[in-house]
Amino acid sequence: MEKLLHVGLDVGSTTVKIVIMDENLNTIYTDYQRHFSDTKNTVCNVLTDLAKKYEDYEFTIALTGSGAMSAANFLDLPFIQEVVSCKRAVEKYIPQTDVVIELGGEDAKIIYFDKSIEQRMNGTCAGGTGAFIDQMASLLHTDPTGLNELAKNHKMIYPIASRCGVFAKTDVQPLLNEGAAKEDIAASIFQAVVNQTISGLACGRPIRGNVAFLGGPLNYLSELRNRFIETLKLEGDAIIIPEEAHLLVAKGAALDSVESSHAITSQKLKSKIEMLRSCMAISNSAEKSREWKNAYQNLIWVMIKKLEMDDSQG
């Protein structure tokens, strides 16, 4: 019998995360990369690397995240709701958690762990998320990491709207024109994210107890975390910053794959990937799409007529 690995993919709004665990559920490999809106191709590339790297293994695989459903359907692999994967990982790695605050590329969530789990998520607007931070950083001619470094030396906080990047820009640009310190503006941008998350998602429900910070922005931007910690008045053990916080949901998917997925060989995985790539080639090429339609339209028409005859009565 071939050795078995458990794989979780978190396909988010801007990134793909993969976690690979051995049979003892120890993490042996992780990867984190932007997909630039090309989710299926990025998932194919990540899984192709997996099949090559561990050619002599079998895999259980589960996909989760806002961009995972279509890829999971094409690959005929289990799709796990993100809140389920998050719950699974939280219960295993940080069971003392009462509330999760998670920021992604274009989404923000607060998850309350009580007698029942309640998730609150932003709508179509990406205000107060990683994309918002990217946009605001560009106004200061830097990137999110540079924004974080600037915020470490701030002295005051200015009010900045974060519901929409357009509104925020109208607040930030006058501050720049008036000569406000970039350090203060950077910290104010992070505070705007905090305000948007708490007011827009918590909607008056208290954030109490042990709070875990998940997602790429909160994993990499220490000053953003600090704005949350200060605003929520968190201290000591109430502050939970798990190791590899940006990968926790992918870890949950890997754990879920143990029960939700049948093991497949690397060769079978390669076949699934090739099938997805061929479907993508047809959908991306007008010529190939026409060829496919011409090849199958007669067959489809015959099937339709046959169904009509089979369903007829009298």
For the regions a protein language model found, what residue spans apply to each?
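Phosphate/ATP-binding catalytic cores across multiple sugar-kinase/actin-like superfamilies
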Residues: S188-I207, A253, L299-K306
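Gly/Thr-rich phosphate-binding beta-strand-loop-beta motif of the actin/hexokinase/Hsp70
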Residues: E2-N24, T97-D114, S312-G314
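Glycine-rich phosphate-binding loops at beta-strand->alpha-helix junctions
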Residues: G67, C203-T231, P242-V249
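Glycine-rich phosphate-binding loop plus the immediately following alpha-helix
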Residues: D38, K115-M156, C164, H246, ...
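Short glycine-rich, Thr/Ser-proximal phosphate-binding strand/loop in the N-terminal lobe
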Residues: L5-N41, N45-T48, Q119, G123
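Flexible inter-domain linker/hinge segments
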Residues: M1, S260-G314
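Adenine-nucleotide phosphate-binding core of ATP-dependent small-molecule kinases
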Residues: A168-S199
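Glycine-rich phosphate-binding/hydrolytic loop that grips phosphoryl groups
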Residues: I133-Q135, I241-C279
